[in-house]
Amino acid sequence: MSLYGVYDPDNVFARILRRDLPSHRVYEDDDVLAFLDAYPQAPGHTLIIPKHGQARNFLELDDRAITPLFSCAKRLMKVIVAELEPVGVQMLQCNGGDGGQSVFHFHIHLVPRWKGQPLGLHAQTPGDAAELAKLAERLRRRVETMSFEQEWWT
């Protein structure tokens, strides 16, 4: 699919938002939903999506959604680093089929990385549902207990 087209209200992420499909939710508020990727590239591979609008990609995203999405991404990256101790975290956002996008509902990937692990766009095999459920619970607990106080430079 190209950058331009009609939003499909039955895409997998829209169905997850409506709870028509199960997901391993890590975080949710009025504006965003974060859940573990069912086809993870690495343990803790998290997807963050807007709960409002019908943006297929970043070009279509309402400006008011940007701050909640990227604030959530920063918080969850801190959670992933604290809980899983990766040596890096890949933050990825693809636009259009030729840009690597496979689900046409705006989303951000957070992929923990460890030394020697190859970079990739999409995993080919689903994660183990029981392991995903355990990991989602660990990350939810960390979200609930972690401080996110921001210090600003002066």
Residue ranges and their predicted role:
Residues 1-154:
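HIT superfamily nucleotide-processing domains
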